[in-house]
Amino acid sequence: MTNPRTPILIGVGQVTEKDPPIDEASSPLDLIEQATVLALKDAGISRENLSDLTTLVVVKSFREPMRNTPEALASRINATKAAQWLAPDGGNGPQYLVNRYSEAIFSGEEDFVLLSGAEAMATGRKIVKSGNKPPWSVDSDKDADLLFADRQMWNDHELKHGIWQASHVYPLFENALRAHYGNSLPDHQIMMGELFSRLSEVAESSPHAWYPVKRSPEEIATATPSNRFVGWPYTKFMNAMNQINQSASLLLTSIEKAEEMGVDPNRWVFLHGASDVTDVWNVSYRENFYSSPSMKIMGENALNMAGLEINDIRHLSLIHISEPTRQAEISYAVFCLKK
């Protein structure tokens, strides 16, 4: 018999809003609410069920639009009884939250959890260019509670030498990888172009891709006025986009709570393996720039927990980090529809 405290993912929602008129554009809070409504629909439950949330977590935006986004969201969706947290931004953040709260649900510390986040920098930039400020703030008498400390990514030595942004650091990694592989500069550039060309092929058919355009390896690898170097050797077409209007929400709960809410078992997605690791935090202290032993350990742990090998994985999602974060904490998970 399956443990009734087994954590399951019951609903997800994703929203992409491209180039809306300024007076009709959604705020980040609007986008999160829309994604949450879609997650409810995906789970087959009603908005009233959100009053049962025990915790909601919002992943911090690059530029937080208000003093206390989790509180504003809780008020908007009538989940004021839930614990409300703001999680620092970072490429591993969403998956870390799934791993953390799945464990908390299994232990009985949590029962029903909403994980959300949004960016509306595309609209925000358009509003600023018009000479105005985004009217997105919601009054609060307190700052949002951070789920964990927002740790600085660089030390004084790195800052002194201009190594503190992702566009400063990832080129060091890439050139170390190139040297490790024994590639020439032109060969490595086209190799990166070939990789991102395959990714652009996936984006071409995705309704949520900000640029659903298939590009050739040469188009991606070659710097042009419309494809400038962002941080050599990376061109614009190799970089993640931060000036977007997108959001996502995810609902986690236990089997017994899902049954209480009447969620169809066909909607249950089980977490079969998970792992979180922290690399050597400051890059200047790392043994080299071309390998990450922690990534290897993380992948092995999650796959071993699931009883699978990498060739058994049908869908693999790798997070592409954009400014201002860079990868030091890494999370991994294996999901399956089967128990």
Mark where each language-model region is.
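Short, well-ordered amphipathic alpha-helical segments that serve as non-catalytic structural scaffolds
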Residues: P28-I45, T69, S254, S291-A306
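Extended, hydrophobic alpha-helical segments in both membrane/secreted and soluble proteins
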Residues: M295-L303, D312-L318, S322, R326
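Single conserved hydrophobic/aromatic residue that forms the stacking wall/gate
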Residues: I319-K339
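Beta-strand segments within the central parallel beta-sheet cores of soluble alpha/beta enzyme folds
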Residues: N49-V59, Q84-P88, L114-A118, H188-E194, ...
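Condensing-enzyme catalytic core mediating Claisen C-C bond formation in acyl metabolism
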Residues: M1-L29, D141-K160, P171, N175, ...
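Active-site-proximal alpha-helical scaffold in enzymes
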Residues: D89-E119, G162-S205, S249-K257, N304-L308, ...
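Conserved catalytic cysteine-centered active-site region
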Residues: K60-K126, G131-W154, K160-S167, A221-G231, ...
